[in-house]
């Protein structure tokens, strides 16, 4: 929410989002006599009688060994049970001043969990407290709400652990509004000034602990234009990763295309103009988090105004957005949402890039089914990274490189020149092992410059973040020197590394000059800025050195006065400065000393002179810390202003990291550089599955050839169960995809024609929630393929029609095969147990039969996993059943029945 210019920035009281407070302004009354954790800034009315030392651990249940017996009557509330469960049930005028303020803020954020800073805790009340205690397993306690109200529900989290707890809330889909203290000392008789400083939602977080390092965190917004009659649905989609600054927009037709795009992107949060109680539309994937918004930010006029204000433009014509009005409206709604959830000051606005317009045909299309079947980024069985294609080929060393490779896999290229540029760089890196190793050595310790720059631009970066930025920028000239020795030209992004921006090197020098090498996590306790940077800070430090000298002299002087050689002048964070002597010497101290504390073996004293000097030291230290904080904020603002060029360099580093990793995989895996063509041919010699071959330990992978698209559009693949047909299908799809991201591929040689889409139908299960049987799921997937495949598509089918009667299934499989080979002309591999489909090859010249070989030795069956021309005549299903452990009598009876049926 907006704040006046006089209010401090979000972290004026915090080193980072949840860090230590800003140095307090020096005060003549400041002393160290108050405990560090005391809530001395809170009035009794604010704290209530129950605030002191309440428990923070989860209450034990009977199964956890609780020694307390359960209540005799569960319906009878205990004395401490809150009387009110929702703030709307109360008259605000009857609440205490603090709770009245809480309710006012909650009314502005009814859909979010409100965390309200009270001393060392963030507290929740009413319904939020009940929900927080349930979700985070915290103790639900109560607080006096007013004389006429009694106790209200309360739960809280320590402020130093707030990031961890908020991360868990965000992970579970909640949004959080943070109300922080905006001053350290209240006006007499008034509450501390507090206000909402941040709103955390799944799509807007910037904190490292709330983000997945190796995947983008997309915030998306959609505008849908209702279909008129039989006209297709028109929609515009805007997506932004606020942590990296990337912005994309697109405008399309057809609700299935919208569903496919949303499923592929997997945004953390989707915004749309709708009422809170609106049902989830059919085009929205079930697992996607929907955030309804008012329609105003999405209106054409308001959206255009928001974009002009954000990008500082008088016209949007230069962005190309007027030609995509629905996408423009979606982006306007997205930026409006960010304005409501992020700081609005010019020096702390999240730096977002100019939107990139994604056109139809820019990338190979992968629907959710294909992504799942090919196991691109997660396994089909348990949704884990290990065992996926990304796991097999990701050898990136930086988080931004990992995100880059993932984006490439999710949107393979269709432009042959762009593919060839990537592949040429991979080839250079494969051939130059020393270059590859040198680059990887430079990349290994590099921080996430993309997100670090974003945090700096938003005003949330800490001192260690800036040091990490400097370290990364200092490595750019070293990368340049290495690259120029082997690579002289390349794509536009590579020029960022071959000719780095000199302003970035200057920025790195500035950071190194001003910040110490290993700054503390807190921004409030000093030790951030080098000596010699600021005359005022140097003067304050010199005065503090003088005070240290006085303390040392005072210690020696008091020893001589008392004759106690073991006397020590020490400091404690809670009690301040004191003179410590042993118990035995306590009677020898002067009478003007004042006893401060008694310990088992030691007595501690203060003197008027020491106390007066302590106040002076604390004032100097507070002024020095305040000055360091001001200097740091100036430096952070300077770094944030350079967020755009830092991110440009970071993207170049990320691409280099991804390509170097692909080069490493290619060199160690015996891959080849595929020949990329504009034709339809797919010729692979001795191709292998990139994941399966890495997981084989005791046996070698059996390579196979592929011939598609040049005379043969449809391959009918037959063979026994468990012989490797599905693996062969997936292998073809993965190699097609790898070639189109610019990678080398696992084969002896490869010629790959660019595909516009990859379709897979491999296995099916019941969708009980949607009321669909296995057969209906299979037919729906098949229908999708037949409606959208073209002659440039690659179609991989593993069985069609097996969920119904034999002749029905065969008829469907035959008709589908004819349509794919004839009307559509798609490059297709169809694995089937319907051996009758082998007859298609005699009817159509563009159909070929292949089989997976098997060898019989007596009753044993040996799978050779080798694909060879010709059709199989048997499926060996009974033999496969025997190998799977089906009881022998059942196997014998199955053979008898088979003999009878085939007689």
UniProtKB/Swiss-Prot annotation:
Disordered: annotated span: 1-89
Low complexity bias (residue ranges): 20-36, 49-62
UniProtKB keywords: ATP-binding, DNA damage, DNA repair, DNA-binding, Nucleotide-binding
Residues engaged in binding ATP: 719-726
A Gene Ontology BP annotation from the UniProt entry: mismatch repair
GO molecular function: ATP binding; ATP-dependent DNA damage sensor activity; damaged DNA binding; mismatched DNA binding
GO CC terms of this entry: cytosol
Keyword ATP-binding: yes
Disulfide cross-links: none
Entries under Gene3D superfamilies matching the protein: 1.10.1420.10, DNA repair protein MutS, domain I, MutS, connector domain, P-loop containing nucleotide triphosphate hydrolases
PROSITE patterns associated with the record: DNA_MISMATCH_REPAIR_2
Family: Belongs to the DNA mismatch repair MutS family.
Function recorded in the entry: This protein is involved in the repair of mismatches in DNA. It is possible that it carries out the mismatch recognition step. This protein has a weak ATPase activity.
Protein name: DNA mismatch repair protein MutS
Organism, as annotated: Synechococcus sp. (strain CC9605)
């Amino acid at each position: 929410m907006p704040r006046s210019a006089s209010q401090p920035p979000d972290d004026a009281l915090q080193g980072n989002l949840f860090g230590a407070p800003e140095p307090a302004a020096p005060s003549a009354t400041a002393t160290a006599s108050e405990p560090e954790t005391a809530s001395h800034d809170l009035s009794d009315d604010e704290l209530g009688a129950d605030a002191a030392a309440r428990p923070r651990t989860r209450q034990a249940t009977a199964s956890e060994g609780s020694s307390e017996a359960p209540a005799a009557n569960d319906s009878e509330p205990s004395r401490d049970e809150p009387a009110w469960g929702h703030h709307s049930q109360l008259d605000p005028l009857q609440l205490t001043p603090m709770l009245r303020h809480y309710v006012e803020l909650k009314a502005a954020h009814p859909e979010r969990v409100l965390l309200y800073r009270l001393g060392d805790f963030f507290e929740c009340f009413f319904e939020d407290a009940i929900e927080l205690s349930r979700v985070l397993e915290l103790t639900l306690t109560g607080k006096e709400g007013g004389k006429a109200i009694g106790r209200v529900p309360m739960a809280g989290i320590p402020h130093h652990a707030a990031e961890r707890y908020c991360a868990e809330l965000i992970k579970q889909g909640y949004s959080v509004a943070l109300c922080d203290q905006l001053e350290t000392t209240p006006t007499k008789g008034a509450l501390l000034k507090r206000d909402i400083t941040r709103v955390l939602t799944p799509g807007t977080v910037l904190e490292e602990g709330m983000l997945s390092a190796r995947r983008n965190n997309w915030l998306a917004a959609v505008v849908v234009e209702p279909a008129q009659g039989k006209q297709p649905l028109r929609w515009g989609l805007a997506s932004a990763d606020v942590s990296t600054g990337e912005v994309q927009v697109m405008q399309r037709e057809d609700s299935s295309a919208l569903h496919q795009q949303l499923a592929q992107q997997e945004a953390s949060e989707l915004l749309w103009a709708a009422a809170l109680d609106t049902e989830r539309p059919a085009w929205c994937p079930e697992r996607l988090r929907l955030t309804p918004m008012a329609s105003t930010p999405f209106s054409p006029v308001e959206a255009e105004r928001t974009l002009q204000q954000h990008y500082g433009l008088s016209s949007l014509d230069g962005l190309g957005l007027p030609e995509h009005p629905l996408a423009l409206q979606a982006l306007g709604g997205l930026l409006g949402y960010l304005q409501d959830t992020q700081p609005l000051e010019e020096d702390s606005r999240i730096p977002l890039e100019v939107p990139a317009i994604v056109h139809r045909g820019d990338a190979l299309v992968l629907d959710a089914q294909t992504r799942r079947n090919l196991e691109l980024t997660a396994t089909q069985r348990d949704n884990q990274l290990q065992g996926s294609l990304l796991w097999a080929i990701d050898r990136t060393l930086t988080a931004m490189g990992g995100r880059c490779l993932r984006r490439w896999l999710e949107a393979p290229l269709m432009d042959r020149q762009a593919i060839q540029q990537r592949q040429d760089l991979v080839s250079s890196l494969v051939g130059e092992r020393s270059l590859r190793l040198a680059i990887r050595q430079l990349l290994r310790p590099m921080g996430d410059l993309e997100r670090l720059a974003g945090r700096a631009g938003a005003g949330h970066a800490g001192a260690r973040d800036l040091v990490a930025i400097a370290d990364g920028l200092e490595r750019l000239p070293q990368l340049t020197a290495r690259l120029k020795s082997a690579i002289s030209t390349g794509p536009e992004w590579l020029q960022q590394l071959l000719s780095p921006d000199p302003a970035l090197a200057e920025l790195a020098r500035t950071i190194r000059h001003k910040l110490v090498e290993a700054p503390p996590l807190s921004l409030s306790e000093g030790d951030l800025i080098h000596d010699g940077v600021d005359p005022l800070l140097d003067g304050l430090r010199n005065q503090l050195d003088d005070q240290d000298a006085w303390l040392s002299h005072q210690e020696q002087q008091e020893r001589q006065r008392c004759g106690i050689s073991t006397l020590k002048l020490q400091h404690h964070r809670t009690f301040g400065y004191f003179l410590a002597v042993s118990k035995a010497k306590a009677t020898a101290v002067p009478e003007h000393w004042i006893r401060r504390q008694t310990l088992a073996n030691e007595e501690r004293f203060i003197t008027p002179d020491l106390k007066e000097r302590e106040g002076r030291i604390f004032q100097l230290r507070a002024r020095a810390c305040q000055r360091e904080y001001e200097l740091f904020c100036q430096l952070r603002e300077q770094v944030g202003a350079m967020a755009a060029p830092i991110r440009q360099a970071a993207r170049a580093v990320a691409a280099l990291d991804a390509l170097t990793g692909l080069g490493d995989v290619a060199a160690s895996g015996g891959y080849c550089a595929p020949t990329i063509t504009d034709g339809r041919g797919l010729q692979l010699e001795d191709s292998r599955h990139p994941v399966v071959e890495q997981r084989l330990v005791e046996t070698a992978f059996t390579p196979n050839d592929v011939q598609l698209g040049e005379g043969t559009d449809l391959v009918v693949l037959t063979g026994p169960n468990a012989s490797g047909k599905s693996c062969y299908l997936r292998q073809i799809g993965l190699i097609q995809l790898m070639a189109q991201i610019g990678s080398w591929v696992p084969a002896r040689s490869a010629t790959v024609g660019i595909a516009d889409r990859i379709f897979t139908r491999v296995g099916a299960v019941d969708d009980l929630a949607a009321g669909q049987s296995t057969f209906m799921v299979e037919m729906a997937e098949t229908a999708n393929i037949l409606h959208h495949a073209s002659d440039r598509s690659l179609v991989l089918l593993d069985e069609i029609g097996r969920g119904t009667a034999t002749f029905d299934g065969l008829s469907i499989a035959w008709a589908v095969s004819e349509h794919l080979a004839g009307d559509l002309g798609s490059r297709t591999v169809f694995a089937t147990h319907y051996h009758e489909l082998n007859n298609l090859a005699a009817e159509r010249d563009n159909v070929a039969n292949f089989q997976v070989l098997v060898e019989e030795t007596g009753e044993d069956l040996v799978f050779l996993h080798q694909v060879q021309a010709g059709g199989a005549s048997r499926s060996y299903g009974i033999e496969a059943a025997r190998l799977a452990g089906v009881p022998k009598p059942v196997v014998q009876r199955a053979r008898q029945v088979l003999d009878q049926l085939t007689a």
